[in-house]
């Protein structure tokens, strides 16, 4: 009796699957482990080796929504420009939706962004910005879209109204609708959409953090990865400030264990210091030895003091690449950066 029941069940399931495929097309439903099933998540490097390791899959996931937020001048746009530069190195097409109208092309070029290949839009309203994003994603020809920033996506009704008019919840409704529309086409087209967001303070919070991000709660739910980026100190050359010490915390991660954090240097005019990261991660992984203020790799002394060691690695590309490969191997990441050593030398 049980075998007859299971045969009937199987028959009913097969006819249901056949009906779904007839109605919605082949591939609209499939077995997770079968052929043409959902593949492993592809990742795109962030330009920071430490952050790639902290994210668990070697970078940010393709075909997902990512949110990067933090206080002013913390390095949000710098980090996304590095993501664009890394994607362009792999031959990807990238777009930058500049709702803040504040992108500096010369700075972007210094970080390695190919301006000739970068698509840029400076929309007038939030609806226009999200419509442009949706069209780019649906085209299937764009690999990465950056929206800078959610706070600057001003709803049309707010722009057309007077300065003092109250428009409670309009921004949140706009974002909520956009997330519902975007999420399916983002997954199908394998395009990553990065939203940069700002921080606001909640009034009257007694316990817990009073900080919140703009645009309501929808983006928090739909994001596969959320990164909190903060400036934690200044980097000085004698009395002159030449960069920021930066901490990034992976607040949410749907593709690997979350809550990891990483620290790196952002140098003014250069971006993320790759050589500084190699030293810090190399010491942690036991690839680089540090005794007192001296850094050494194998039998070779790299330099006395962090800045001297960074200069040595900039000048000796082969040693920098060897250290990077060993760090990647220690964390189980691919050796995909060894072919082009230029990016080590830049920072």
Curated annotation (Swiss-Prot):
* UniProt-annotated location(s): Cytoplasm
- Give one GO term, molecular function aspect: ATP binding
Query: SMART domains from the entry?
Result: AAA
Give the SUPFAM superfamilies listed for this entry. Answer: P-loop containing nucleoside triphosphate hydrolases (SSF52540), RecA protein, C-terminal domain (SSF54752)
PANTHER family reported for this sequence: MITOCHONDRIAL DNA REPAIR PROTEIN RECA HOMOLOG-RELATED, RECA
What does the UniProt function comment say about this protein? Can catalyze the hydrolysis of ATP in the presence of single-stranded DNA, the ATP-dependent uptake of single-stranded DNA by duplex DNA, and the ATP-dependent hybridization of homologous single-stranded DNAs. It interacts with LexA causing its activation and leading to its autocatalytic cleavage.
Q: Would you identify the family this protein belongs to, as annotated?
A: Belongs to the RecA family.
- Give the protein name, as stated in the record: Protein RecA
What does the organism's lineage look like at the top? Bacteria, Pseudomonadati, Pseudomonadota, Alphaproteobacteria, Rhodobacterales
| Gene that this sequence comes from | recA
């Amino acid at each position: 009796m049980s075998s007859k029941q299971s045969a009937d069940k199987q028959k009913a399931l097969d006819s249901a699957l056949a009906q779904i495929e007839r109605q919605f097309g082949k591939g609209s439903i499939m077995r997770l482990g079968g052929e043409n099933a959902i593949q492993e998540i592809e990742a795109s490097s962030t330009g920071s080796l430490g952050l790639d390791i902290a994210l668990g899959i070697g970078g940010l996931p393709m075909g997902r929504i990512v949110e990067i937020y933090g206080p002013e001048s913390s390095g949000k746009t710098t980090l996304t420009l590095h993501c664009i530069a890394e994607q362009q190195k792999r031959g990807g097409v990238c777009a930058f939706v500049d709702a803040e109208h504040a992108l500096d092309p010369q700075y972007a070029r210094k970080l390695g962004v190919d301006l000739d290949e970068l698509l840029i839009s400076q929309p007038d309203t939030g609806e226009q910005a999200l419509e442009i994003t949706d069209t780019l994603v649906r085209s299937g020809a764009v690999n990465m879209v950056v929206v800078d920033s959610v706070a600057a996506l001003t709803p049309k009704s707010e722009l057309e109204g007077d300065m003092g008019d109250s428009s409670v919840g309009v921004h949140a409704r706009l974002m909520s609708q956009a997330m519902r529309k975007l999420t399916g086409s983002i997954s199908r087209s394998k395009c990553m959409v990065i939203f940069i967001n700002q921080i606001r303070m909640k009034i009257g919070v007694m316990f817990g953090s009073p900080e919140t991000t703009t645009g309501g709660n929808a983006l928090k739910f739909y994001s596969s990865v959320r990164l909190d980026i903060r400036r934690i100190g200044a980097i000085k050359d004698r009395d002159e400030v030449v960069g920021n010490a930066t901490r990034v915390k992976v607040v949410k991660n749907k593709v690997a264990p979350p809550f990891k954090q990483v620290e790196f240097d952002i140098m003014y005019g250069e971006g993320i210091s790759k050589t500084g990261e190699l030293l810090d991660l190399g010491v942690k992984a036991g690839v680089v030895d540090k005794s007192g203020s001296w850094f050494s790799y194998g039998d070779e002394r790299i330099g006395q003091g962090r800045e001297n060691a960074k200069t040595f690695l900039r000048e000796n590309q082969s040693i920098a690449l060897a250290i990077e490969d060993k760090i990647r191997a220690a964390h189980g990441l691919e050796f995909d950066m060894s072919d082009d050593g230029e990016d080590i030398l830049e920072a």
